[in-house]
């Protein structure tokens, strides 16, 4: 190592130490002065991890639900370095937080870690930049556009059926199949075609991984896991970001591939759109209706003010955003739906009978939406098994959050609002709200599609963008692609439940949920195999 390199490392070390000391002082002051310290909650378990290790050691929402039962609707617990975090299931408070997206934003730590992988896409940016991107992207996710994409959903769902039939032919009936694997391949293929007209061809039995597929696999894996120390330190202490590590190198290499191929796609699509605008006839087919093409068309509109246009970099950042947001969530939601159907065979059969009442294998979006029991099954799956169980916001300014239900603070005083200081983190408990007995009744933990025939009045206050639940959040940062996800999920369930009968391949107690950004199934006795959902599958034969 040269003298210059040593000097650079020493300088970085000194800078990192100075930043760390400064941040530690600021954090100590914040902990000591935060109004959250007066809110009741569980005792601190560890100075470094706070209560986070307890949370990650249990299934999503289980520990939180226990805390609510013991300490009430509004509590605090400890996060990284014992910092206070607000936790509330008060629907008025949550509505206030979600509707004031400028005042309550994603934490810098989460934005850095996600941004390192995804770039400055819609999931990451805040404020005016978010509004600008969303304004351009909204039309691409409207009902008319999703209606045009339904053909892709149905086609890929049928291809997954062929994929599993091939597995069954090899091993006999019923075949033990990891359904999560096939569903992940299918949703990746869908978002490739529907997102930017790119064929990943993951469901091709004889296919080989392509360059872009491999790059995104690296990016997906980098988002998994808990307590990766150096990436966490880099997020907290910016000078450390200048020191390369193995994870950063892998991400940089994958992003280089994504950038090169993404810019090729964008350049090609822009040229096609401009040629069409110049008078050449554009083909009216699905290939010209993918989300990226619609985004570029909207961005090139002649009536769009120049200040509202996105740069090519902003457009490029949406490619990995489409993939991450539209791939993992839908595949895991559908996997949990199939799991729920194995635990309620009468529901599975009732659903199958409704699906067979449609005299086509290629339903339209409207036909899928006209199936009431399918709608109820999807709603109940998203309620009980929300793919994203929680999220975090941070107060960007001192504020007072209103409450429906007052709480008693640690000094015995009744409080009808929550005071927060700038920098205070707030946990948004998506799954806890979805499974709240106070809102949904004593059977809230149970999978019962029939509950959607008449829902309790209390759930009308849940601040969700869809179906009186929090699964797609609410407010200005509600999931922009919820219609896309729901129709894709319906197309999958339609094809799969018509084609196959499903049973769980292991005892129910063997299945657990991994606590990560997305809820993934695991088998307790096969943890070394990673996330999986093994089901016994056999073809369904109509009588």
Swiss-Prot record:
Carbohydrate attachment sites? Answer: 332, 434
Do you know which Pfam families this protein is assigned to? p450
Q: What class of enzyme is it?
A: oxidoreductase
Q: What EC number(s) does this enzyme carry?
A: 1.-.-.-
Q: Which Gene3D superfamilies did the record assign?
A: Cytochrome P450
List residues binding heme. Answer: 479
Give the record's pathway. Secondary metabolite biosynthesis
Name the coenzymes or cofactors required.
heme
Q: Which residues form a coiled coil?
A: none
**Gene Ontology molecular function, alphabetical:** heme binding; iron ion binding; monooxygenase activity; oxidoreductase activity, acting on paired donors, with incorporation or reduction of molecular oxygen
Topology in the lipid bilayer is annotated as:
Single-pass membrane protein
Q: What is its main location?
A: membrane
- The membrane spanning regions, by residue number, are 9-29
GO cellular component terms, alphabetically, are:
membrane
| Record key words, sorted | Glycoprotein, Heme, Iron, Membrane, Metal-binding, Monooxygenase, Oxidoreductase, Transmembrane, Transmembrane helix
Location relative to the cell: Membrane
Q: Which family, according to UniProt? A: Belongs to the cytochrome P450 family.
What this protein is reported to do is described as: Cytochrome P450 monooxygenase that is able to use carbazole and phenanthrene as substrates for oxidation.
PANTHER family xref list: CYTOCHROME P450 (PTHR24305), CYTOCHROME P450 12A4, MITOCHONDRIAL-RELATED (PTHR24305:SF166)
Q: What is this protein called?
A: Cytochrome P450 monooxygenase 205
Q: Which organism is it from?
A: Postia placenta (strain ATCC 44394 / Madison 698-R)
Upper classification of the organism? Eukaryota, Fungi, Dikarya, Basidiomycota, Agaricomycotina
Primary gene name: CYP205
